[in-house]
Amino acid sequence: MSEFRTEKDSLGEVNVPADALWGAQTQRAIDNFPVSGQPMPSAFIAAVARIKQAAAEANASLGYLDNEKRDAIVEACEQLVNGEYADQFPVDRYQTGSGTSTNMNVNEVIAAVAARAGVEVNANDHVNMSQSSNDVIPTAIHVSAVTTVQTRLLPALSHLCGMIYEREALFSEQVKTGRTHLMDAMPVTLGQELRTWREQLLATEKRVEAAVDDLMSLPQGGTAVGTGVNAPDEFAGQFVKFLATDTGYHFRSLEHKFVGQSAIDSPVALSAQLRGVAIVLTKIANDLRWMNSGPIHGLAEISLPALQPGSSIMPGKVNPVIPESVAMASAQVMGLDTTVALAGQSGNFQLNVMLPLVGANLLDMVDLLSNASSILANKAIKGFSVNEDNLNAGVGRNPVLVTALNPEIGYALAADIAKEAYRTGRPVIDVAEERSGLDRPRLEALMDPLKLTRGGVS
């Protein structure tokens, strides 16, 4: 048996591996773009397959595609969505800017799968009916992003928030020294500190959800340039109806399809919100690293779970590996967002020509953030222990507590008391008792660290 077979397209003949399901156009792309060795993510291929399925159903409902071909295309698409033939989509993500190579890769594989089932289906005339790469690929960016954010990222963030809430409630009255500029400040509770992280995450969730809702509007039906040439007038409406049924998401048709093809503003907006998630995760990771620092000459407020030896030369050293991993993943997300922003500038006239890059980057961002959120919840937040002695020993001696005396004795005298406490190393309450004119019980009431975490004026 020959190692290759000959396929033909409008440019001529091409040798294709004999056992490959793809055809001539896919093979040309494989030959033309040996750039990264990274194909489009599987979630993107699944989204294109969903688009092909809904398009076949729409075309059949309008009388343009016979039921036998529709059923063969739909069955092939279901197989692709379920991960079958995953090795048949090798086209590099750094390819033609419209993503035509990936669109044709999917078209050709679907046609081949249908042929195996005994139905002759043409990749262009039937699988790609009423479509262009120029509306399929932007639509696939939307569909794949919506699907992965809803099924992966939002559940991961919700799990992280829930884990933080559990620890937050546990430490609601554990007082610690607050820090501004990394310097000692007024006391807070560990619960307040944890709640801050949770509130940040909840806010980013809402912003991501809003960006996802914007992505529900699809440019499918705009075909080549946004006008809808070669697509029936009713196609776009029928398409979103079937896609919503097939996926369970309430997709809608973009009124002015040009804006979803010549520009990618909605994907860029989602990317920015994903960057926002990365920024929050970085803040949490950095706080955890500082709180865990030491254990002898650092803050040593908490102890993160010991997950692996930290050094190949220093015995006994254990490092905060989960926060470090989360910080690196978050940095990568921020870099990917910058790339998406640059790609968003590449909308020349009627088509953006960095579509595969945007689609792949968004899915990489979702993967990184989902996984980072999960390990942060399960391997850091869940298992850290609190070093109560360290927290309690420092907070009561903190000269900054004299801030609570400002309303009673004025800023200037309070500053002098703080300076003397710093200079002598004596407890600030002892210095205040000598110099403030207030008795010990009053000072204890005013400078009670737990009371000070509740705000107000004593």
Residue ranges of model-derived segments:
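Conserved, well-structured ligand/cofactor-binding cores
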Residues: 1-458
